Amino acid sequence: MLILSSRYAMKRDVLIIVIFTVLVLIIISRSSSIQAGRFMTTGRNRNLSVARSLYYKNHHKVVITEMSNFNKVRRRSSRFRRKTDGDEEEEEKRSIPTGPNPLHNK
């Protein structure tokens, strides 16, 4: 019985040592990858932040170009309206009234 108990103790000790060394190796590899900047979540977050900044940068450019195109079209359409609309009634409707505001006079 003494031999069986010592074999069981040896197997248990070997198993504990193997598990402990595997855990130590995992911790060491993770710490070295964190220092090298290759840790999975760090790289993923960095890529996401770069992607966000590029998206906002490109989106801002698109908004600016769309607005400039809109202004060009608006200018052209207003010139075209001035040329085609020769009626005085249309101009009177578009004119801004000057003087005191009639809503304030009660």
Swiss-Prot record:
One Gene Ontology biological process: maintenance of root meristem identity
Disordered: region residues: 72-106
GO cellular component, one term: apoplast
Keywords (A to Z) from UniProt: Developmental protein, Differentiation, Glycoprotein, Hydroxylation, Secreted, Signal
InterPro entries (UniProt xref): CLE_plant
Glycosylation sites: N47, P100
Biased composition (Basic residues): 72-82
Residues annotated with Hydroxyproline modification: P97, P100
Domain of life: Eukaryota
Signal peptide: 1-31
Tagged with keyword Signal: yes
Family stated for the protein in its record: Belongs to the CLV3/ESR signal peptide family.
UniProt-listed PANTHER family: CLAVATA3/ESR (CLE)-RELATED PROTEIN 22 (PTHR34545), CLAVATA3_ESR (CLE)-RELATED PROTEIN 21 (PTHR34545:SF8)
Protein name, as recorded: CLAVATA3/ESR (CLE)-related protein 21
Lineage of the species this protein comes from: Eukaryota, Viridiplantae, Streptophyta, Embryophyta, Tracheophyta
Gene designation: CLE21
